[in-house]
Amino acid sequence: MKEKIVLAYSGGLDTSVAVQWLIDKGYDVVACCLDVGEGKDLDIVYKKALDTGAIECHIIDATKEFSDEYVSYAIKGNLMYENAYPLFSALSRPLIAKKLVEIAEKTNSVGIAHGCTGKGNDQVRFEVAIKALNPSLKAFAPVREWAWSREEEIDYAIKHNIPVSINHDSPYSIDQNLWGRANECGILEDPYAAPPEDAFDLTNALEETPDTADEIILTFVKGIPVQIDGKTYELDDLILTLNALAGKHGIGRIDHVENRLVGIKSREIYEAPAAEVILKAHKALETITLTKDVAHFKPIIEKQFAEQLYNGLWFSPLTDSLKLFIDSTQQYVSGDVRIKLFKGNAIVNGRKSPYTLYDEKLATYTKEDAFNQDAAVGFIDIYGLPTQVNAMLNGGYSNEQ
């Protein structure tokens, strides 16, 4: 009896070719495809997996689990890698790895294969996650092992009658889920080349956006958006709704050259309409609900959390601790944020919360002012004392300095 390998199958070029390649190596292939909100026709994926030679294909709807247990932390933690990338691909990898391990254990497979290249981040994310969940499972990386160029891979697919929706003229590599869409390869590899419109799918070009703005009210409960204009949604449905609405206005296009885990720079074209709107709104709500010290310290944790996730360390003691901290900051991050959507921009026009720390009577300069300005004199004396002592003992600073 042949040994079984579970393959993370997407229906794309890399994993379709990987099925045939693993068969040639003497394995039975168990394909596994997760739906994490990418809108893919999974019936077609299922059929393609079997047509290319897999003995089984498991289709798993993990959209709600993805939104509730993974994307929720991206929102509460304002997670952005290098202040640009909302981490949607990185967010899905630990969940995919978790499901692959479950299928491998159920089917008595000896290992797990993925379609990642040897120069990308995902090979690390998958294999480290698999080691964390079940160290006894072997990891297989066909694309890394065969080391073909994109053109050679396409030729192999054509030779073996593997149906793939890709050609030499438009060799994009696309990854998409509920939280966003990533596009690379082809002309996009030139960081100076303007991305053509066919590189985008979720967002309109500015020239095609409406000339009238939409204004919405996002309601949050403990850091998670739960309503749009008073209508309650599950998180996954809310994100999909915002993707359509914000994408219509051209919101969420990101052109970024990022520093990959493996040490190279990579030009990526991202689309994240809902993510841009939600994260802007969430940050705005935090400005009135977090204390000053938490508001100043939390970005340090957010940066570390984003790097943990980007670097494939979701299943780690540090990430567990970071999640606990993020959760602790969100107890009072509830309220409404008003946002204007127009011509590629998500503009925060207002925010309110039953837990607001903003006291208008303390902030106002009108006759309603309740701030005791006399207290400022003593505060300045104490606050400035170290500076004053330094000036007295060391001569202070000259005007030239």
UniProtKB/Swiss-Prot annotation:
Tell me the superkingdom of the source: Bacteria
Q: Where does L-citrulline bind?
A: Y85, N121, R125, S173, E258, Y270
A GO term for molecular function: ATP binding
Q: What is its EC number?
A: 6.3.4.5
Q: Which InterPro entries match?
A: Arginosuc_syn_C (IPR048268), Arginosuc_syn_N (IPR048267), Arginosuc_synth (IPR001518), Arginosuc_synth_CS (IPR018223), Arginosuc_synth_type_1_subfam (IPR023434), AS_cat/multimer_dom_body (IPR024074), Rossmann-like_a/b/a_fold (IPR014729)
Is S-adenosyl-L-methionine included in the keywords of this UniProt record? no
Could you say which enzyme class this protein belongs to? ligase
* Binding positions for ATP per the UniProt entry: A8, Y9, S10, G11, G12, L13, D14, T15, S16, G115
Give the record's keywords alphabetically.
Amino-acid biosynthesis, Arginine biosynthesis, ATP-binding, Cytoplasm, Ligase, Nucleotide-binding
- Tell me if Ligase is a UniProt keyword of this record: yes
Subunit record text: Homotetramer.
> What's the name of the protein?
Argininosuccinate synthase
Q: Which organism is it from?
A: Staphylococcus aureus (strain bovine RF122 / ET3-1)
Give the classification, highest ranks.
Answer: Bacteria, Bacillati, Bacillota, Bacilli, Bacillales
Name of the gene this protein is made from = argG
